[in-house]
A protein has these predicted regions:
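Dual-mode signal for accessory low-complexity, basic/Gly-rich regions
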Residues: 1-134
Length: 134
């Protein structure tokens, strides 16, 4: 992705064959992503969110690498009026990665440099979340 425009796909041999395209040699997935950071802190993103869920943990492996569809267990905190209110757990997030990336409003400067994926917190304008109140 360059300037918000998709430039190409990350394809294993299998997915390249299915799409009648050329492999990019990424059969094991992506291991070296660096997204640009901004001046926003995670607290800034939480305030900008207003109300929603701050995800802090994803559980399981529910991503289709060919279609980008995902369904993952998650946990985090409920946010109301830009303030963390209480923990939430046993929720599910679902959607499509392409659509999710198009919904990024801002990326924070709290980059975790452990591992090969360097990215700050992301604020999405919408996401499908399911769960029940106890």
């Amino acid at each position: 992705v360059s300037d918000g425009v998709l430039q190409g796909y990350i394809l294993s041999s299998y997915s390249a064959r299915k799409l009648n395209m050329t492999t990019t040699g990424n059969s094991g997935g992506v291991h070296n992503i660096r997204l640009p950071e901004s001046q926003y802190t995670q607290d800034d993103l939480i305030k900008q969110m207003g109300s929603g869920v701050l995800l802090t943990e994803l559980i399981g492996n529910g991503v289709n690498p060919v279609t980008g569809d995902y369904s993952r267990g998650a946990a985090g905190f409920w946010v109301e009026n830009g303030e963390i209110q209480y923990p939430v757990q046993e929720i599910t997030i679902a959607g499509n990665l392409k659509e999710m990336f198009q919904r990024i409003v801002a990326i924070g400067n709290d980059v975790d440099t452990c591992g090969g994926i360097h990215c700050g917190s992301m604020l999405m304008d919408q996401m499908t979340v399911a769960g029940s109140a106890e």
